[in-house]
Amino acid sequence: MSDIGDWFRSIPAITRYWFAATVAVPLVGKLGLISPAYLFLWPEAFLYRFQIWRPITATFYFPVGPGTGFLYLVNLYFLYQYSTRLETGAFDGRPADYLFMLLFNWICIVITGLAMDMQLLMIPLIMSVLYVWAQLNRDMIVSFWFGTRFKACYLPWVILGFNYIIGGSVINELIGNLVGHLYFFLMFRYPMDLGGRNFLSTPQFLYRWLPSRRGGVSGFGVPPASMRRAADQNGGGGRHNWGQGFRLGDQ
C-alpha cells in the first residue's frame, strides 16, 4: 500500500486531482451512493432545473460495467500518461497556465455537450489533452500496440479508431480532438507561427493562486520551455525535435 501511496503522491498536482476524481466519481455511482442519473449532463436538468453540478460530474463520471470497463481503464491510463507529460513537460513550473488550458477545453466541451446532447464528457476532455501533447511533440516517433510506429501527431486519430473498436464513440473522441486543436491553434499556431494576436490569456487570479515556480514570462502566446529549447537547438527553424519516442504502456 505504501508503494501505491508513493506512486499517487508522485503524480503532479493537477493531474493527481483530476485522476482521483475520475476514479472516485464512477466508484460513487457504481456503489449507488449517488444515483448515476444525477451525474450525467442533461441539458434540460442543467438549464431549467438549475442542477449546476452536472457539467462537473459528467466530466469525471463514466458508467463502468462489463462492457465498458476496459474502455474506462484505457482512457484512465491516457489521462495519467499524457496529462502528466504535459504538466511536467511543456507546462513544467506553470500550473496556472496548465489549469487554464484544462478550463478552456472543459468549457468548450461543456458548450458542445449541451448543444449536441452529450451526456458524458470524460473522454472528450482526456482526448483534448492528448491532442495538445501530440501537437507539441508532433515529430516524435511513438510506438503503439503490436509494434506499430508513427509520428505523435497521428496518435489522437489512431486512438480515436482504437477507442471505437473497443466500444467507444467516434463523436466523443472527435470532439476532444477538435477542442484540443482549437486550443493549440489559438495558443501556439496562430500567434507564434502565423503572427496573429493572442486570443487567450491566463487570468491573473490563477497566477496568484498557482504562481509559476520558475523565472520567465508566463501566459499564452509564449512557447513552453520545451518548445523554446527545441527551437534554440534547431536554430529557430520550423521543424522541432522534442525528444525520443516511448512505447505506449511504458512508465
From Swiss-Prot:
<feature type="modified residue" description="Phosphoserine">
    <location>
        <position position="201"/>
    </location>
</feature>
<dbReference type="InterPro" id="IPR007599">
    <property type="entry name" value="DER1"/>
</dbReference>
<dbReference type="GO" id="GO:0031648">
    <property type="term" value="P:protein destabilization"/>
</dbReference>
<feature type="topological domain" description="Lumenal">
    <location>
        <begin position="167"/>
        <end position="170"/>
    </location>
</feature>
<feature type="modified residue" description="Phosphothreonine">
    <location>
        <position position="202"/>
    </location>
</feature>
<keyword id="KW-0472">Membrane</keyword>
<dbReference type="GO" id="GO:0031398">
    <property type="term" value="P:positive regulation of protein ubiquitination"/>
</dbReference>
<feature type="topological domain" description="Lumenal">
    <location>
        <begin position="32"/>
        <end position="69"/>
    </location>
</feature>
<protein>
    <recommendedName>
        <fullName>Derlin-1</fullName>
    </recommendedName>
</protein>
<feature type="topological domain" description="Cytoplasmic">
    <location>
        <begin position="190"/>
        <end position="251"/>
    </location>
</feature>
<feature type="transmembrane region" description="Helical; Name=4">
    <location>
        <begin position="123"/>
        <end position="137"/>
    </location>
</feature>
<keyword id="KW-1133">Transmembrane helix</keyword>
<dbReference type="GO" id="GO:1990381">
    <property type="term" value="F:ubiquitin-specific protease binding"/>
</dbReference>
<feature type="modified residue" description="Phosphoserine">
    <location>
        <position position="226"/>
    </location>
</feature>
<feature type="topological domain" description="Cytoplasmic">
    <location>
        <begin position="2"/>
        <end position="15"/>
    </location>
</feature>
<keyword id="KW-0812">Transmembrane</keyword>
<dbReference type="GO" id="GO:0002020">
    <property type="term" value="F:protease binding"/>
</dbReference>
<dbReference type="GO" id="GO:0044877">
    <property type="term" value="F:protein-containing complex binding"/>
</dbReference>
<dbReference type="Pfam" id="PF04511">
    <property type="entry name" value="DER1"/>
</dbReference>
<dbReference type="GO" id="GO:0005769">
    <property type="term" value="C:early endosome"/>
</dbReference>
<feature type="transmembrane region" description="Helical; Name=3">
    <location>
        <begin position="95"/>
        <end position="115"/>
    </location>
</feature>
<dbReference type="GO" id="GO:0031625">
    <property type="term" value="F:ubiquitin protein ligase binding"/>
</dbReference>
<comment type="subunit">
    <text>Homotetramer. The four subunits of the tetramer are arranged in a twofold symmetry. Forms heterooligomers with DERL2 and DERL3; binding to DERL3 is poorer than that between DERL2 and DERL3. Interacts (via SHP-box motif) with VCP. Interacts with AMFR, SELENOS, SEL1L, SELENOK and SYVN1, as well as with SEL1L-SYVN1 and VCP-SELENOS protein complexes; this interaction is weaker than that observed between DERL2 and these complexes. Interacts with NGLY1 and YOD1. Does not bind to EDEM1. Interacts with DNAJB9. Interacts with RNF103. Interacts with HM13.</text>
</comment>
<feature type="topological domain" description="Cytoplasmic">
    <location>
        <begin position="90"/>
        <end position="94"/>
    </location>
</feature>
<keyword id="KW-0597">Phosphoprotein</keyword>
<feature type="modified residue" description="N-acetylserine">
    <location>
        <position position="2"/>
    </location>
</feature>
<dbReference type="GO" id="GO:0044322">
    <property type="term" value="C:endoplasmic reticulum quality control compartment"/>
</dbReference>
<dbReference type="GO" id="GO:0005047">
    <property type="term" value="F:signal recognition particle binding"/>
</dbReference>
<dbReference type="GO" id="GO:0016020">
    <property type="term" value="C:membrane"/>
</dbReference>
<keyword id="KW-0813">Transport</keyword>
<comment type="similarity">
    <text>Belongs to the derlin family.</text>
</comment>
<feature type="region of interest" description="Disordered">
    <location>
        <begin position="229"/>
        <end position="251"/>
    </location>
</feature>
<feature type="topological domain" description="Cytoplasmic">
    <location>
        <begin position="138"/>
        <end position="154"/>
    </location>
</feature>
<feature type="transmembrane region" description="Helical; Name=2">
    <location>
        <begin position="70"/>
        <end position="89"/>
    </location>
</feature>
<dbReference type="GO" id="GO:0051117">
    <property type="term" value="F:ATPase binding"/>
</dbReference>
<dbReference type="GO" id="GO:0036502">
    <property type="term" value="C:Derlin-1-VIMP complex"/>
</dbReference>
<keyword id="KW-0945">Host-virus interaction</keyword>
<dbReference type="GO" id="GO:0071218">
    <property type="term" value="P:cellular response to misfolded protein"/>
</dbReference>
<dbReference type="GO" id="GO:0030968">
    <property type="term" value="P:endoplasmic reticulum unfolded protein response"/>
</dbReference>
<dbReference type="GO" id="GO:0005783">
    <property type="term" value="C:endoplasmic reticulum"/>
</dbReference>
<comment type="function">
    <text>(Microbial infection) In case of infection by cytomegaloviruses, it plays a central role in the export from the ER and subsequent degradation of MHC class I heavy chains via its interaction with US11 viral protein, which recognizes and associates with MHC class I heavy chains. Also participates in the degradation process of misfolded cytomegalovirus US2 protein.</text>
</comment>
<dbReference type="GO" id="GO:0006986">
    <property type="term" value="P:response to unfolded protein"/>
</dbReference>
